[in-house]
From Swiss-Prot:
This protein's name: Protoheme IX farnesyltransferase
Reaction catalysis annotation: heme b + (2E,6E)-farnesyl diphosphate + H2O = Fe(II)-heme o + diphosphate
A GO cellular-component term linked to this record: plasma membrane
Originating organism: Methylobacterium sp. (strain 4-46)
Pathway listed: Porphyrin-containing compound metabolism; heme O biosynthesis; heme O from protoheme: step 1/1
Pfam family, one: UbiA
EC numbers on record: 2.5.1.141
Function according to Swiss-Prot or TrEMBL: Converts heme B (protoheme IX) to heme O by substitution of the vinyl group on carbon 2 of heme B porphyrin ring with a hydroxyethyl farnesyl side group.
Source species taxonomy: Bacteria, Pseudomonadati, Pseudomonadota, Alphaproteobacteria, Hyphomicrobiales
Listed transmembrane segments: 25-45, 54-74, 126-146, 154-174, 181-201, 227-244, 249-271, 281-301
C-alpha cells in the first residue's frame, strides 16, 4: 500500500510515522461536509411521497455519510502536498504529520467499499451505484484531475456535492424523480458563487499551491461577473420546487427572500472590488450562501417532514 501511495502522490514523505488518534482519523472524513450530506440526503428522502422503514432510512443515511467521508479522506490523501502549503489546510492530519498517507488511503478505500456495499444491501443497488459514482467522481475526477487542471474545477466537481438528494430519493423509491433532480440542480448552481466568493479572498493561497481557481486564471473582475450570473440563475431555480408542487408557502417565501438576498450580496461583491470592503463583501456572500442553502432545505424538510406543507395556490383560492 505504501509503494502505491509513494508512486502516485508526493504527499508520501510528509510523515514517516503515524501518531494519529481517533479524532485525527475522524477529521479526515471532513465532518462538516458529512453533516451537510446527511441533511441534503434526508431532504431527498422526505420530498418523495413514498415511505421507507425507519431503520433502513437510518442505516442508509449513515452509509451515505460514511461514503461522503470516505471521498473526503481520499481527497485529503491526494491533496496532502497542496494542503501543506495552504494556510487554512496545513493543520489537517496528513500534512501535520499525525497520519501517514498510506494509512489515509487504506482508511478511505475501506470506508468507500464498505459504505457502498452496505447501502446496496440495506436499501437498493441504484442508491449504492449513485453513492459509488459520487465517491469516484469526487476522489478521482475532481481531486486527481479537475482541481489542478482547470478553473472550472468546482463547477464540474460540484456535481459530487449535489448528488446526495438524488441518493436519498433513490433509497426511498428505488428511482430518481424530478424532485431529486431539481435539488441536485439547486446545489450544483449554488456551488460556484459559494466557492468563488471564498476564492476571491484566498486567491493568494490558491496561487501559492498552484490551484487554478477562477480568480487566479480569469481574474477577480471576471469571477465577480460569473458570480452574479450564477446567482441570477440560482434565484429563480430556487423557486422550481414551488412550480413543481413539492415546495409550499413556507418554502416559497424562504426561496424568494433568500434568492433576492443572494442577488443583493452578489451585486455587492461585483461593485466592491478593492480593499477591505471587497474581502468583506466576498466573505459576506460566502457566509450567507451557506445559510441560504440550509434555510431552503430546512423549509422543505419542515413542510414535507412535519406536515406544514400548504400549496401556494391557497393564496389565490
Amino acid at each position: 500500500m505504501t509503494s502505491l501511495t509513494n508512486s502516485l502522490n508526493p504527499a508520501r514523505s510528509l510523515a514517516p510515522a503515524s501518531n494519529g488518534d481517533v479524532a485525527d482519523f475522524f477529521a479526515l472524513l471532513k465532518p462538516r461536509v458529512m453533516a451537510l450530506v446527511i441533511f441534503t440526503a434526508l431532504v431527498g428522502m422526505t420530498v418523495t411521497k413514498s415511505h421507507v422503514n425507519p431503520v433502513i432510512a437510518a442505516v442508509s443515511l449513515l452509509m451515505i455519510a460514511v461514503g461522503a467521508g470516505a471521498s473526503g479522506c481520499l481527497n485529503m490523501w491526494w491533496d496532502a502536498d497542496v494542503d501543506a502549503v495552504m494556510s487554512r489546510t496545513r493543520t489537517r492530519p496528513i500534512p501535520a504529520g499525525k497520519i501517514r498517507p498510506d494509512e489515509a488511503l487504506a482508511f478511505g478505500m475501506t470506508l468507500s467499499v464498505g459504505s457502498v456495499l452496505m447501502l446496496g444491501l440495506a436499501a437498493n443497488w441504484l442508491a449504492a451505484g449513485l453513492l459509488a459514482f459520487t465517491i469516484a467522481f469526487y476522489a478521482v475526477i475532481y481531486s486527481m484531475w479537475l482541481k489542478r487542471a482547470t478553473a472550472q474545477n468546482i463547477v464540474i466537481g460540484g456535481a459530487a456535492g449535489a448528488l446526495p438528494p438524488m441518493i436519498g430519493q433513490a433509497v426511498v423509491t428505488g428511482t430518481v424523480g424530478i424532485e431529486g433532480l431539481v435539488l441536485f440542480l439547486i446545489i450544483f448552481v449554488w456551488t460556484p458563487p459559494h466557492f468563488w466568493a471564498l476564492a476571491l479572498v484566498k486567491s493568494g493561497d490558491y496561487a501559492k499551491a498552484g490551484i487554478p481557481m477562477m480568480p487566479n486564471v480569469a481574474g477577480p473582475d471576471s469571477t465577480r461577473r460569473q458570480i452574479v450570473a450564477y446567482t441570477l440563475l440560482l434565484a429563480p431555480l430556487g423557486l422550481a420546487p414551488v412550480a413543481l408542487g413539492f415546495g409550499g408557502l413556507i418554502y416559497g417565501l424562504v426561496a424568494l427572500l433568500g434568492g433576492l438576498a443572494m442577488l443583493a450580496l452578489s451585486l455587492q461583491v461585483y461593485h466592491r472590488r478593492e480593499g477591505e470592503g471587497a474581502d468583506k463583501a466576498a466573505m459576506g456572500l460566502f457566509g450567507f450562501s451557506i445559510l441560504y442553502l440550509f434555510l431552503l432545505f430546512s423549509a422543505l424538510l419542515a413542510e414535507q417532514g412535519l406536515g406544514l406543507f400548504r400549496p401556494v395556490s391557497q393564496l389565490f383560492g
